[in-house]
Amino acid sequence: MEMVDNRQGLMKMLVKELGFTEKQVRHVIQLTEEGNTVPFIARYRKEWTGSLDEVQIRAILERWQYMMQLEDRKEEVLRLIGEKGKLTEELRRHIVTATKLQEVEDLYRPYKEKRRTKATIAKEKGLEPLAEWLLLYKKENPAEKAMEFVDGEKEVESAEDALQGAQDIIAELVSDNASYRSWIRNTTFRKGIMSSSVKDKEKDEKNIYEMYYDYEEPLQKIVPHRVLAMNRGEKEDVLRVSVVTPIEEINQFLHKKMIRDEASKSAHYVQLAIEDGYKRLIQPSIEREIRKELTETAEEQAIHIFSENLRNLLLQPPMKGKVVLAVDPAYRTGCKLSVVDDTGKVLNIDVIYPHPPVRKYEDAKKKVLSIIDKYQVEMIAIGNGTASRETEEFIVDVLQNVKRDVFYIIVNEAGASVYSASDLAREEFPDLQVEERSAVSIGRRLQDPLAELVKIDPKSVGVGQYQHDVSQKRLNESLTFVVETAVNQVGVNVNTASVALLQYVSGLSKTVAKNIVAKREEDGKFTKRTELKKIPRLGAKTYEQCIGFLRILEGANPLDRTGIHPEQYKNVELLLKSLGLSKNDVGKPNLQKSLEGVDVSKLSQETEIGEPTLVDIIDALISPERDMRDELPKPLLKKGILKLEDLKRGMELEGTVRNVVDFGAFVDIGVKQDGLVHISKLSKQFVKHPLDVVSVGKIVKVWVDDIDTKKGRVALSMLPIE
């Protein structure tokens, strides 16, 4: 009964903390404990959750998990202290009402099994009574009292030795006091300073950490990316980093708390113990805790930025139905070419040498023109790696000889080389060379960014900030969640999807994804959703979780084309029948006419389908193959080229956001180097974070602010240059 009450109490705390209703929180936890996935709950249990999205559901679950860990730790600490016979009612109350793991650890500290410390050694020598006597602040001389504890056998050779041991015990007593630690931690955070100085300049060859050679910033104000930069500089042995604390104020606080009689001769020894306890035990420990907390906050921010950038990259609009010529640029080894048809099938692989040292420019030109003509190429995708700009110039020259409209796009090829050398790429294209696979990946990345990018480790897609400096476990969890959310929001064509894409579908594991592809290759395309029930290891619960996200576009049942879950098919058929329609009318104008402007509230009562679900069903019936990505702005199509030398201050351009970081955004304006829009130049209004204004893949209007041709750098502004 106590556990049930405790759960309800924790849920109420969660409601207060996150601002959701008790019903929403309770249902999210219940649905998850019943084995439902986040995408499934978000899409198909809207009546239960009040239409919470994936991010909100995850926030509830993460906080709930922390609370459960906290409760487990409280129970363990209560048991451990209880076994020692030292659990008072007051201590129990403090532990039970603690809201952070750190508070529980502070309360447990005095009772923790310690390794041998100065204090434990002093206690072994029988000096605890002397420490207790000092804290009584009697009028007697402590040096005389200490003589009673001199004992050669116990290695207490003098009164000084005895007093030192007693001070060590008092120092640890001060350090173990939970309320003192809490006050010191809060005061240090409010008034402390993060400081860095140069340790070994020689190790900073590129002067990356120059601004931190002599740097100070209040702990309360330091921004996340500076915390991570300092940490990295310290790790690379370039910087010395520390927390400067308000020592005087802290010592005064401890003095006031510990010394009850200034006139007593004991006060001097207790003061020495306080100062030692703070400097030797509390300060290093609090500094570690604060730096750990700042690092965790900074890591969360870096992970959040990476996740947002990745989400925007994955959800870039696909260029559907286009025959694409992809070019993976290079100098010496030549530019690899790949033609992929409108389904992503590879039609042609080739190589050209338009650049030095080989430079067969005219031959390369003829070959590309022939390919464009033969395969009726509509788009050219150029990877943005080595030799990208020179290749762009070459393609622009080629296109001048093409009479119809053929556009080109610079495609972010980050991770393409990682993918092309992977086992997955070898399985997919066993007969192709690594560079040839890379060209195919670039072309397909333009046609369907999501389907292609899921094949690559998210950490390799080139939109992170300090991703190697953060908790890899936490980063992987967050990025996997982003990919899963994107894949399930878009939906998957079960007859064309790769294992890499299917494994992110709600409820599916990599093994089941492989089984689906194996069955498809063996028996041909699936014609109805129910056929998936025959897949090995795809049980009833897995089927329920995944099936709504898997589409069959040319199947026997038109509802299988949609995002409508089969659990609603009977209701949907009754709904259509009541309107004089059938499932064969899905997506047709007559159905659209019948459903547009319908009274959803009234229809919901008549059909017993919840309103939020009914709205989704109506949308799916009207636009069965709707892709949320199609509503976003298409990538920037190009025909001409721009050089760094062409740029002038104040020039107005359009560009594509390639990466967003704490201090601004990098924008591809068509020159060799992406330009930086500093956070201060993003908007006339105050911008708390660049992500509030821009996102990866967004097309933005910018003005050239400054050009450094020597370093190849361009500063941009999203505000007109006056």
Name each model feature, range by range.
Residues T37-V38, T49, D53-V156, Q489-E631, ...:
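Accessory alpha-helical DNA-binding modules that contact the DNA backbone or grooves
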Residues G19, P317-P318, E484-A518, K639-V677, ...:
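C-terminal accessory/binding modules appended to enzymatic or scaffolding proteins
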Residues E289-S307, S460-G491, S604-R649:
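Long, charged amphipathic helices and adjacent flexible linkers at domain junctions
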Residues E103, I409, G415, S420-V490, ...:
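Long, charge-rich intrinsically disordered scaffolds of nucleic-acid metabolism proteins
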Residues M1-R26, E33:
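Generic start-of-chain signal for non-secretory N-termini
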Residues M147-A159, Y215-E216, V244-I247, N251-Y278, ...:
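Low-complexity, acidic/Ser/Thr- and charged residue-rich accessory regions of DNA metabolism proteins
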Residues Q56-A59, Y66-A326, R332-S420, L424-D431, ...:
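Duplex nucleic acid-engaging cores and interfaces of nucleic-acid transaction enzymes
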